[in-house]
């Protein structure tokens, strides 16, 4: 019986490992450059469909691909999607996660929404307090629709 439990645990671990989200990194200077010169006058309206089939319209920055690097430092262009999650770690090692297409960036702050269901609650992080930026596809069933 213990062999069956061990075998099941190994299989579950392997499934989790193979299906886990791949994390990429955005150097802070690169992040600032990718948003440089953008302001709210450039926002475009998009419509997303959620896992329950619901549709939501909102405005987002017109970024189609995000320049980032993999764990080995190789450059990668990640296609923007509503399921992308961006994780900021500040100088105190506090982590904040936003949906990438629901962030806004100005000269001093990154603002974002942490939930697609309660979009009225926003949070701000000072740009100069950001130590690392990670981005990954959370594999949540959100997609852009025309």
Feature locations, PLM:
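N-terminal intrinsically disordered, low-complexity, charge/repeat-rich segments that act as generic
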Residues: 2, 21-22
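Hydrophobic helical h-region of N-terminal Sec-dependent signal peptides
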Residues: 10-15
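C-terminal motif of bacterial Sec signal peptides marking the signal peptidase cleavage site
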Residues: 16-20
């Amino acid at each position: 019986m213990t062999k069956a439990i061990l075998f099941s645990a190994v299989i579950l671990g392997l499934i989790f490992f193979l299906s886990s989200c791949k994390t990429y990194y955005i150097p802070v200077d690169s992040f600032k450059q990718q948003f440089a010169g953008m302001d709210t006058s450039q926002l475009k309206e998009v419509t997303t469909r959620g896992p329950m089939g619901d549709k939501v319209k909102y405005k987002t920055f017109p970024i189609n691909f995000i320049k980032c690097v993999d764990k080995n430092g190789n450059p990668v262009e990640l296609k923007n999607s509503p399921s992308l999650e961006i994780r900021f770690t500040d100088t105190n090692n506090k982590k904040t996660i936003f949906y990438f297409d629901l962030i806004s960036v100005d000269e001093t702050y990154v603002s974002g929404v942490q939930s697609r269901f309660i979009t009225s609650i926003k949070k701000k992080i000072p740009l100069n307090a950001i130590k690392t930026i990670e981005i990954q596809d959370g594999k949540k069933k959100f997609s852009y629709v025309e």
